[in-house]
A protein has these predicted regions:
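Extracellular and organelle-lumenal recognition/adhesion modules and their flexible linkers in secreted
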Residues: 1-175
């Protein structure tokens, strides 16, 4: 795996024309003209070109980028920026490879480029909270904090730092 805190990785052997994709939480919202930042950590058994694409729910390409992945038994980080070439609120992100190869993906992130102060929060939601002028906001709350048991309850110290270095946690809603 990528590091001791990451308990799983996705090992994929791409066949010619093969593709993997992720639909996010009920779809990946893609807006025409918006920018998206993608990065992933991967190790590969050969040099290859990975095409990362924003796709409609039906699989139509809404914007893509190509990344040259190098043969390496250690994880390397790969970054690209995608521009939405159409709008589909139930889109997806896909990865394809230009040849037969085996790639292990240790962590993948796709985020809109435009977020509140660059920290990943949706601007409209963060501004609504900011505009309340609250002196205290309880977040997260309820059963999210307590976890399924004491061992996997959320601890603040495990929620800071680079996201790919943090341990994953199974939440009460099982995602």
């Amino acid at each position: 795996t990528l590091n001791p805190n990451r308990k799983a990785a996705l090992k994929v052997t791409f066949a010619p024309g093969g593709k993997i994709y992720n639909i996010g939480y009920f779809g990946v919202p893609v807006k025409e003209g918006d920018q998206y930042r993608l990065y992933f950590f991967a190790e590969s058994d050969t040099d290859a070109v990975i095409t990362a694409a924003l796709e409609s729910e039906e699989g139509t390409d809404l914007g893509n980028c190509e990344l040259s992945v190098h043969k390496d038994s250690d994880y390397q980080r790969y970054d690209c920026e995608l521009t939405g070439g159409g709008t589909d609120f139930k889109g997806r992100i896909s990865l394809t490879c230009d040849r037969v190869c085996t790639i292990t993906l240790g962590f993948i992130s796709l985020m809109p480029a435009k977020t509140f102060k660059g920290h990943g929060l949706r601007e409209d939601l963060a501004m609504a909270l900011k505009n309340t002028n609250a002196k205290f906001i309880r977040f997260p709350g309820g059963c999210v904090v307590e976890g399924i048991n004491e061992q996997n309850a959320l601890r603040f110290s495990r929620t800071i730092g680079p996201v790919w270095e943090r341990p994953g946690a199974q939440l009460m809603w099982h995602y």
